[in-house]
């Protein structure tokens, strides 16, 4: 048995969907433990491309149980659209379950999210405008709705009658927006509730039963370490905890059941939205990475900012998550480059540092210290073993493993499921050096 967490080691969009899909073949249960529809996972199987937002990537395996856990926030309208879309493609959702204690994104959450971002002006954060932050804010403020509230029509309407007027004060007086009608919200959400009812369960109990019966459980995070509310580049972060520790809280399990933590990182770095990004490239190389890597957000369609691999934030992700091994994705995007840079430290205003600074203002003034490696100038998309990779591509991976002080278990060389090099079984293999890294 192995219970594994898959976590993003950068600013999200690392390719966790593909890695989770790949690992789901040996998982009995896949659990999405935090976030909402602000995340997007793209999985390519043969000629089909699946873009998922809230439903775990394991849904593509008919016998795998998929859980949307308590730590997530659920937009009923979008979730139902996602379910319908999968079923139209012939993908069954009979093994999909939604935690009754997950919080619900309401219409006013979206309105407030968009209006507040506009009000911030030049201080905007870069939110997706999907209402995620306001939903988590109401959760913390104890004024939120949970999925189980939707299942109780009388109590739901009663709560709406005192919450909606409060939100209308904000909408009308602060944001100059029209008020919401209680009747309209109630009718809309109670209709959603009836459609979602067959999926709603006590998710923590289901997960506990899976643990007790020695099932393989895969915990799937959204976003990435540097977007974590507590450990990311605050305030340019999400409103939940994508780090490995968030899996235990979001899923309702104890840390002692976790066997492995796998970090996913691109062979370069991307970021969506605002915030410091030391290795960002605003030149032809940056444009090449964006075009070759199809760097557009699955959820928003916004172009991602692109830059060189940052080993400083990588080491930070290793430390914060306790990573056992890494999956490096999109190596093939670098195939045509003459030379490739890796950030190994930062020049801060007064000194050179090799560790990530917590202060976003200081981080914004850091300049990258690079080491330059030769490119390999040949395609890698056909490679299925390390030996088939160009020697300089292997050298690059060795360098990343050494800088991160963490072994690499998987290498992705294309979007499709089969375009993956399995260096060593990331779930059942021994925790030892891969690609020559020995922990020194």
From Swiss-Prot:
Residues where substrate binds: 298-304
GO BP terms in the entry: 'de novo' AMP biosynthetic process; IMP metabolic process
Cofactor binding remark: Binds 1 Mg(2+) ion per subunit.
Catalytic activity: IMP + L-aspartate + GTP = N(6)-(1,2-dicarboxyethyl)-AMP + GDP + phosphate + 2 H(+)
Claim: Cytoplasm is one of the keywords in the record: yes
Binding site for IMP: 13-16, 38-41, 128, 142, 223, 238, 302
Membrane-spanning parts: none
CDD domains: AdSS
Pfam family, one: Adenylsucc_synt
Pathway: Purine metabolism; AMP biosynthesis via de novo pathway; AMP from IMP: step 1/2
Annotated Gene Ontology cellular component terms: cytoplasm
Subcellular location: Cytoplasm
UniProt-annotated binding residues for Mg(2+): 13, 40
GO molecular function: adenylosuccinate synthase activity; GTP binding; magnesium ion binding
Predominant localisation class: cytoplasm
UniProt binding sites for GTP: 12-18, 40-42, 304, 330-332, 412-414
Active site: 13 (proton acceptor), 41 (proton donor)
Cofactor: Mg(2+)
Record key words, sorted: Cytoplasm, GTP-binding, Ligase, Magnesium, Metal-binding, Nucleotide-binding, Purine biosynthesis
Subunit text: Homodimer.
PANTHER family registered for this protein in UniProt: ADENYLOSUCCINATE SYNTHETASE
Family of the protein in this entry: Belongs to the adenylosuccinate synthetase family.
Function: Plays an important role in the de novo pathway of purine nucleotide biosynthesis. Catalyzes the first committed step in the biosynthesis of AMP from IMP.
Name recorded for this polypeptide: Adenylosuccinate synthetase
Organism listed in the record: Gloeobacter violaceus (strain ATCC 29082 / PCC 7421)
Organismal lineage: Bacteria, Bacillati, Cyanobacteriota, Cyanophyceae, Gloeobacterales
């Amino acid at each position: 048995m192995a219970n594994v967490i898959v976590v993003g080691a950068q600013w999200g969009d690392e390719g966790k969907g593909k890695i989770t899909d790949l690992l789901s073949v040996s998982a009995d249960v896949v659990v999405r433990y935090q976030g909402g529809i602000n995340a997007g996972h793209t999985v390519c199987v043969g000629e089909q491309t699946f873009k998922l937002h809230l439903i775990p990537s394991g849904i593509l395996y008919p016998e795998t149980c998929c859980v949307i856990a308590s730590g997530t926030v659920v937009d009923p309208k979008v979730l139902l659209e996602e379910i319908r879309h999968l079923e139209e493609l012939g993908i069954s959702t009979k093994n999909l379950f939604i935690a009754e204690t997950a919080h619900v994104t309401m219409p006013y959450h979206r309105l407030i999210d968009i209006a507040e971002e506009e009000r911030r002006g030049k201080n905007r954060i870069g939110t997706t405008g999907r209402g995620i932050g306001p939903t988590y804010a109401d959760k913390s403020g104890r004024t939120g709705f949970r999925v189980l509230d939707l299942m109780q029509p009388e109590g739901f309407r009663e709560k709406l009658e005192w919450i909606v007027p409060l939100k209308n004060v904000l909408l009308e007086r602060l944001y100059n927006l029209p008020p919401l009608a209680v009747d309209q919200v109630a009718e809309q959400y109670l209709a959603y509730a009836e459609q979602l009812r067959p999926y709603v369960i006590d998710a923590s109990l289901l997960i506990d039963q899976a643990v007790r019966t020695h099932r393989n459980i895969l915990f799937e995070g959204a976003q990435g370490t540097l977007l974590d509310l507590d450990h990311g580049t605050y305030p340019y972060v999400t409103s939940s905890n994508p780090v490995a520790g968030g899996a235990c809280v979001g899923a309702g399990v104890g840390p002692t059941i976790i066997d492995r933590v796998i970090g996913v990182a691109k062979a370069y770095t991307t970021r969506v939205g605002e915030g410091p990004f030391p290795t960002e490239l605003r030149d032809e190389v940056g444009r090449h990475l964006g075009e070759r890597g199809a760097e557009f957000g699955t959820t928003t369609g916004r172009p991602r900012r692109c830059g060189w691999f940052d080993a400083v934030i990588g080491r930070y992700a290793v430390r914060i998550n306790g990573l056992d091994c890494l999956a490096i994705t999109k190596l093939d995007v670098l195939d045509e480059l003459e030379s490739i840079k890796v950030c190994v430290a930062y020049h801060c205003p007064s000194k050179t540092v090799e560790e990530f600074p917590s202060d976003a203002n200081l981080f914004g003034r850091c300049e990258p210290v690079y080491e330059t490696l030769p490119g390999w100038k040949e395609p890698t998309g056909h490679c299925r073993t390390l030996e088939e990779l160009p020697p300089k591509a292997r050298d690059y991976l060795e360098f990343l493993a050494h800088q991160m002080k963490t072994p690499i278990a998987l290498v992705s060389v294309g979007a499709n499921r089969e375009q993956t090099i399995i260096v060593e079984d990331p779930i059942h293999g021994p925790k030892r050096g891969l690609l020559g890294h020995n922990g020194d």
